[in-house]
C-alpha cells in the first residue's frame, strides 16, 4: 500500500476537524479529496505533511511502509510527501537554476552523498527540463516570477 490512513481523527486548537477518516491509495492511483469548505481537506493535507498545529487524537498513517506519525516534516518531505501550494509564491531576485542546485545539494548532503558540481547539475537540469516540457532558457528567470499558473505547477 502506497498510502494507508486508518481511523484518523485530528484537532486544531481543541476543535475536532477530522473524525475517523480512512483512505487507502495504491501506487500509481490518483484520488481527489473533495468537499465543502470546512470539511477537513486542508486539515488532512496539513496532518499528512506533519504541521505541528494539528493534534492527532487517533488513527494511523502509513506512507511507503513507514509510520508517518513517527516522522518530522523534513523526514516526510524526503520521502516525497509535501504540500504544493495552490498559488506558489514568487521570489524576485532568486534565480531558478542556483535555487534548484542548492536544494538538490542540501538533499544530497542530508543523505551523506557528495554534492553535485555545476557542470553535472546543468546536464541533469537540461534533461529534466526537456522531460517536463520546460524551455531551458526559462531557467534563468527568478523563481515563479511572471510565470503562468501552469508554469508555476511544472516548476513545483
Predicted segment positions?
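Helix-to-loop junction immediately C-terminal to a conserved catalytic motif
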Residues: 49
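ABC ATPase NBD Q-loop/coupling interface
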Residues: 60-76, 144
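ABC nucleotide-binding domain signature
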Residues: 32, 77-86
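ABC-family P-loop ATPase nucleotide-binding domains
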Residues: 89-156
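Conserved hydrophobic segment flanking the Walker A/P-loop of ABC-type ATPase nucleotide-binding domains
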Residues: 25-27
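The feature captures the beta-strand-to-loop junction immediately N-terminal to the Walker
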Residues: 34-36
Amino acid at each position: 500500500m502506497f498510502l494507508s490512513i486508518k481511523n484518523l481523527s485530528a484537532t486544531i486548537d481543541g476543535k475536532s476537524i477530522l473524525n475517523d477518516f480512512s483512505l487507502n491509495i495504491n501506487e500509481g492511483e490518483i484520488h481527489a479529496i473533495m468537499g465543502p469548505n470546512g470539511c477537513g481537506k486542508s486539515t488532512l493535507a496539513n496532518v499528512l505533511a506533519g504541521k505541528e498545529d494539528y493534534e492527532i487524537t487517533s488513527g494511523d498513517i502509513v506512507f511507503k511502509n513507514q509510520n508517518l506519525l513517527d516522522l518530522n516534516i523534513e523526514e516526510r518531505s524526503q520521502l516525497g510527501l509535501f504540500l504544493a501550494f495552490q498559488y506558489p509564491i514568487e521570489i524576485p531576485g532568486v534565480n531558478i537554476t542556483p535555487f534548484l542546485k542548492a536544494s538538490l545539494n542540501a538533499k544530497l548532503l542530508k543523505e551523506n552523498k557528495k554534492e553535485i558540481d555545476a557542470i553535472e547539475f546543468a546536464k541533469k537540469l537540461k534533461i529534466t527540463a526537456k522531460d517536463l516540457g520546460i524551455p531551458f532558457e526559462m531557467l534563468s528567470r527568478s523563481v515563479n516570477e511572471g510565470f503562468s499558473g501552469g508554469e508555476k505547477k511544472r516548476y513545483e
